[in-house]
Amino acid sequence: MDQGPINRPHFFFTTAPMPCPYLEGHLERKMVTDLTGPEAERLHESLSRAGFRRSHTIAYAPVCPGCTACVPVRIRARAFVKNKSFRRIVRANAGVTAEYVPARATVEQFHLFSQYQQARHGESDMALMGFFDYRSMVEDSPISTSIAEFREAGGELVAACLIDHLSDGLSAVYSFFNTTLPQSRGLGTWMILWMVDETVRRDLDHVYLGYWIAESSKMAYKERFQPLEVFGRRGWIAFDERGRPG
C-alpha cells in the first residue's frame, strides 16, 4: 500500500465534553476527522499509526482535559507466544471455524450482537441499537474492512469481529459473541488469539486492540496479550517501558 504524503489539507475537530463510558465521574472529549475521498485509506493508515481509531467514516482519538487514561495498544504478533491459559482456550474452541465475509450486516449477526449487548452492556447506548444502526456500524467504512464470522461445527454463529485491514496488521474494530456459552470458552480472548495467528499468516506485524485503560475492567484485559506496545509521546514503545522517562 502506498504510504506517501496526504496531498490536501485535512481538518480536525474536537467534540463537546460527554460523560466518560469507562471512568465514572470523568468527561471525555475526542479529536475527530472525516475519512472521506480518495485519500481515506492512506489517511486512516497514518492516523492508526498515531493512535487513532475508526468508527463509521470518522477517525478519532481522546483529548480529554487532565486525563491520559486511554492508551493505544497493539500486539507484536510475530513475537507472541500463547501461555498455558491461552492454549486451554484454543483447545476449548477447536471445533470453531472462521470465515472472512464482506462488511455487510446480516440479521443473524445482529441477533448475536443484540444478545451480547444486553448481557454485557445493558445500560449503554449500544444496547439500544436497532438493525439499521448495526448496519451503519458495519457497512459505513471508507476503507478495507471485513467481518470474521466464527461458527460451531453445526453452523451456529457464536462470535464475530469487525476488522480493518492495515498494511502492517489487523485492527479489531468491534467484536461480540454468544454470552450464554460456558465462560471457559473465552470467546472474546479466542478471537484476539485468532487475529494474532491470522496476522502472522498474512506476514504482517501487529494486531491493533484500541485503547487500554488500567482503571477500567472493560479495557484493562488487553495487557494480558504480551508483548504489547503502547503509543505516546515517544511513539510506539514496549508496554513495560511506558513509565520510563524519554
Curated annotation (Swiss-Prot):
Chief localisation class: cytoplasm
Domain of life of the organism encoding this protein: Bacteria
Entry's EC annotation: 2.3.2.29
Keyword terms, alphabetized: Acyltransferase, Cytoplasm, Transferase
Catalytic activity line of the entry: N-terminal L-glutamyl-[protein] + L-leucyl-tRNA(Leu) = N-terminal L-leucyl-L-glutamyl-[protein] + tRNA(Leu) + H(+); N-terminal L-aspartyl-[protein] + L-leucyl-tRNA(Leu) = N-terminal L-leucyl-L-aspartyl-[protein] + tRNA(Leu) + H(+)
Record keyword Transferase present: yes
SUPFAM superfamilies xref list: Acyl-CoA N-acyltransferases (Nat)
Single GO term (MF): arginyl-tRNA--protein transferase activity
Enzyme class: transferase
Subcellular location: Cytoplasm
Function of the protein: Functions in the N-end rule pathway of protein degradation where it conjugates Leu from its aminoacyl-tRNA to the N-termini of proteins containing an N-terminal aspartate or glutamate.
Family that this chain belongs to: Belongs to the R-transferase family. Bpt subfamily.
Listed name of the protein: Aspartate/glutamate leucyltransferase
Organism of origin: Rhodospirillum rubrum (strain ATCC 11170 / ATH 1.1.1 / DSM 467 / LMG 4362 / NCIMB 8255 / S1)
Gene field: bpt
